[in-house]
Every structure is written in C-alpha cells, then in structure tokens.
Regions:
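Active-site anion-handling motifs in enzyme catalytic cores
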Residues: 1-310
Length: 310
C-alpha cells in the first residue's frame, strides 16, 4: 500500500514531529510500499524520517498515486487557529476522496469548529472516512453528535519506549508563549525555582523555536537576575535531541502536552503547567503536580514535585 500522511509537519513542533515519526515507523513495520509525508520542509522531513515528502501545496500528485491518505495526528480539524487552516486540511482530505482514495483519521483532536460552513464540510468529509481514531472524549462526543463512529485512543507519543537516565542535579523548564505567561507568572515561577533548585543545573527547553524562544530567553534572564547562573538553553531541538535532553533530567517543569508525556515516559519527576485542558487531564491521569497560570501560590505543587518517589 502507498500512503500519504497529512499533518502539521515540518514546522519544528516537537509533538507533531514525534507523531509523524511514530506513524511512519508503524506503517513501515506493516509493510508499506511507499510513505509520502506532506511537509512545510520536505527535504528535512525526508532526511529525518526516511520517507518521501512533498510540499504543503504540492500534494496532489502524491495523493493521485497513493492508496490511502492518513490525516493526523494533532488538532488539524478545528478553526480556533484559523478558518484557513481548517480549509487546508479538509482540502487534502477532499482531494483524496475525489480521486477515490481511502481516508483514515489518525489520533486527532477534532474541534472546536465554530463556523457553520466548517462544521458542514468537516462532517461531510468524516462521514466518508474509512477509519477514525480520536485522542479525547470531547472529540468522540462531537463525532457521536454527528452520528459518526470513532475509536478513542491514547496519544501516540505515549507509545514511545524511552531511556530512564534521570541524572541527578538537572532541572528542565519548558515554556511557551501564551497569554497568561506574563511577568507576574514568570517571577513567581522563578522564585520557586530559585528556592528549590538553586544548587542544580537548569536547562530551558524551547520545543518550537518560533513560539518558545522569546519566553525561554526572558525566563533565563529573570533567573540570572535572581542569582542563578548555571543555566543553558537547549539549542538543538530535533526529536532525538529533545528526547535525550528530557530523559536525562531529574526534574521537569513543562507547559507543552508532549513535553509532559516525554517526562512521564522517561520517569522524570514532572510538574505540569496548565494552559490547555489536555494538559490538565494528563496531569490528573498520571497524578502530576499541576500549577495554573493564574494561581497565586505555587509552593504546594512544588512541594509535591520534590517529594521522594515511592
């Protein structure tokens, strides 16, 4: 079988790149004849994953010669980012349907879709999909309300088998730009880090440079102003580099969903920063300490983080 994979790939987003790698490995193990991934950086994707790749607007020839289109994972079918984004990912699906190809939806979070047109187009496409797996109950409930069957699955990154090195004395901090990550939040977070980890090495982990770098550099500067000097910012952010860096930590304080997953899988003591319901749910499922962006005091959750493991 020849497969085309459509996702948010080539943008150096750690979670989406990890899912693309897991999916391509799965397809190879099942004997796929050819895998082509649609990417914003086809050359890099091809080199990193050992597959064929085509540009975001040059997918049609690959779809025409394929047997199956796989759309996912991630949150592709939503218009919270933009209506244009939803239309693009639907256009890929509709192209496959028009040319008589099988369509599978892989481990996606569906919605929110606010526009009536977006809902109609998404519903029409998904009713024609061969198989749909979703990563959360909310997505499954939405599809159920549309009378579309789906299977609930765990996020693919949870399937990774990771080394558990956990070097003592190293703390990883992963932040992203977000409306609640303001000076007040960063100062409170820095105070707790200085209080608990002044004697440890601090590594700041920007997992998507275009979004994470500015706040990462700002937080590093705040820590230096508070007297913490053993700080570095991870420069290499390839999939392997990030996994190795997180696996090597004693502690991890992280916002991004997939950073928290890697911490969990690598056996790192992890504190989650809640900016998205999926992070809150993950923390609840794995009993992680959790701080909210608007919490007045972080001390109780940091106490939980520093408790010895049973």
């Amino acid at each position: 079988m020849k497969y085309v994979v459509s996702g948010y790939i080539g943008f150096d987003n750690f979670g989406d790149e990890a899912i693309a790698k897991i999916l391509s490995q799965k397809l190879k193990s099942e004997g796929a004849e050819k895998i082509t991934i649609i990417s914003s950086n086809p050359e890099k994707t091809s080199d990193n994953l050992g597959v064929c790749s085509c540009g975001m607007l040059k997918f049609l020839p690959s779809i025409i010669e394929s047997d199956v289109l796989i759309s996912g994972g991630g949150s592709l079918l939503q218009d919270a980012t933009s209506f244009k984004s939803l239309v693009y990912y639907l256009a890929v699906i509709y192209s496959a349907l028009i040319f008589g190809k099988k369509v599978e939806i892989f481990a996606q979070g569906i919605g929110p879709i606010k526009s009536k047109l977006g809902q109609f187009l998404t519903k029409f496409a998904l009713k024609r999909a061969l198989k749909i797996t979703v990563r959360d109950e909310k997505s499954q409930e939405l599809l159920k309300s549309w009378k579309i069957d789906s299977e609930l699955v765990k996020d693919p990154v949870l399937e990774l088998e990771l080394p558990q090195k956990n070097s003592r004395g190293t703390v990883g901090i992963q932040l992203r730009n977000y409306k609640g990550v303001d000076d007040s939040f960063l100062q409170k977070l820095a105070d707790e880090v200085c209080k608990r980890f002044a004697d440890k090495k601090i590594i700041i982990l920007p997992l998507q440079k275009s979004i994470d770098t500015e706040v990462s550099e700002k937080f590093a500067q705040i820590l230096r102003e508070k007297g913490i000097n053993n700080i570095s910012i991870l420069e290499k952010t390839s999939l392997t580099d990030v996994i190795d860096a997180i696996s090597d930590l004693e502690y991890l304080i992280a916002m991004r969903f997939h950073a928290n997953i890697v911490g969990i899988k690598a056996g790192v003591k992890t504190l989650a920063i809640n900016y998205d319901p999926k992070v809150e749910k993950l923390a609840s499922e794995y009993n992680l300490p959790l701080i909210n962006l608007d919490d007045k005091d972080f001390s109780e959750e940091f106490e939980r983080l520093c408790l010895p493991l049973n």
